[in-house]
Design a protein with these regions (language model features):
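Structured catalytic-domain cores with a bias toward divalent-metal coordination
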Residues: 1-391
Length: 391
């Protein structure tokens, strides 16, 4: 870990990827990295590829022990996010809770940064704040939010939301935008801290991010690409917002595709990592994972059922085939300071494992690892995480 700490240096935000969304070895390494960065480098936030509102609930548990973690995971980790309901992530969250019990004056926080869902918790926080601090706006805000907050489980809510006509989804985004702009135009009420006001505005922003994200025409491939770019921009903005308003150094956890600089996937024209580099410059560092062979959890692209999949040894000509020929089975590589011959090799795109939430994936991803990340962690073999959610 000390070698990784030296590579990270003074970076304020570290993006730590994963080559699959369901391998325990990536998650356990993230746990190790988080512990090291918290205990040795002063990091105080872990930000996951998870909706902002879900992060709010998990953070309440991490800080105060509020609620039951198993129940929170069942209720918040749904739909495409259900892969996070695994033993390795719950272990990581429990470590954060244990750390905070021993360091109540200097806690570590959990944050979501994605836009895929806005739970009832956010609507309550915004409307309660308005009722207390700007009671003359209460009727306006409750009217604009009327019928928008989820009243079912998250998966059902999202399924039904995407079945709404495009015009209705566009109208909902317009309503959430008006609430956001209404709050942005107000100063903190007397007796209200600036921080409380800013957090409420951010919660309203997260509600609008979801509504706007789902206001794109999902039957149009070009608009889907625009939505994916919007999603990565939002994820970057939420991380940058947390850093700006808390001062926390942050470990960001997401797929390699998101934390990278290079948009090697045509569906993601600009990545979260590229947006963070624009806003933070050298204060953002990207770490990617690679692996030679192994297993992972994913949901079937045909039936949406979660199961274990396995891939055999990486093919000759792939990035992993060559990376696995090093003397060490598992190792770190600082791409920025590698010998010239290595950097030249890393600058060329080659087939690479890039496994998301669903499998199989017919696409072949050609990635120039040296353009995608600052640091690589290569693992010879990985195994599937222990999934705790519904199939």
């Amino acid at each position: 870990m000390n070698a990784l700490g030296h590579m990270v240096g003074d970076a304020e935000v570290v993006g730590l990827g994963e080559a699959t969304h369901g391998s325990r070895d990536f998650f356990r390494m993230k746990h190790r990295v988080l512990r090291y960065l918290v205990e040795q480098k002063g990091f105080r936030a872990f930000s996951l590829e998870l909706p902002w509102s879900s992060g709010v609930r998990v953070n309440e548990y991490v800080l105060y022990g509020k609620g039951d973690l198993d129940r929170i995971a069942r209720e918040e980790f749904q739909g495409s996010y259900r892969i996070w309901n695994n033993q390795d992530y719950l272990d990581l969250i429990e470590w954060m809770r244990a750390y905070n019990r021993h360091h109540p004056a200097d806690p570590v926080h959990f944050a979501g940064n994605d836009m895929g869902y806005a739970g009832p918790e956010l609507y309550r926080r915004v409307t309660d704040h308005v009722s207390r601090t700007h009671p003359h706006l209460r009727s306006r805000v409750t009217t604009l939010y009327d019928g928008l907050a989820p009243t079912t489980d998250a998966a059902t809510y999202l399924e039904r939301y995407l079945e709404l006509p495009l015009t209705e989804r566009e109208k909902r985004a317009e309503r959430t935008r008006k609430v956001l702009e209404l709050l942005q135009s107000r100063r903190p009420a007397p007796g209200t801290s600036r921080q409380e006001h800013l957090w409420t505005v951010q919660h309203a922003r997260a509600i609008h991010q979801m509504a706007k994200g789902y206001s794109y025409d999902i039957t149009d491939e070009a608009r889907i690409t625009e939505m994916m770019k919007y999603r990565d921009r939002v994820m970057a903005e939420n991380v940058a917002w947390w850093h700006k308003h808390t001062g926390d150094r942050i470990l960001l956890s997401a797929h390699n595709t998101h934390v990278s600089y290079d948009a090697f996937d045509p569906r993601y024209p600009k990545t979260q990592g590229a947006f963070l580099r624009d806003s933070l410059g050298g204060n953002y560092v990207s770490i990617g994972f690679s692996f030679h062979s192994g297993a992972f959890k994913a949901f079937g692209t045909d039936d949406n059922v979660m199961r274990t999949y396995r891939v055999n040894a990486a093919k000759p000509g792939s990035n992993e085939h060559t990376l696995d020929r090093a003397r060490q089975r598992d190792y770190l590589l600082d791409v920025r300071t590698a010998p010239h011959a290595v950097r030249t090799w890393l600058a060329e795109p080659r087939p690479t494992w890039n496994i998301g939430a669903g499998w199989p994936d017919p696409m072949e991803y050609r990635i120039a690892l040296g353009k995608a990340h600052d640091i690589l962690i290569h693992l010879n073999e990985v195994e599937a995480t222990t999934y705790l959610g519904s199939p």
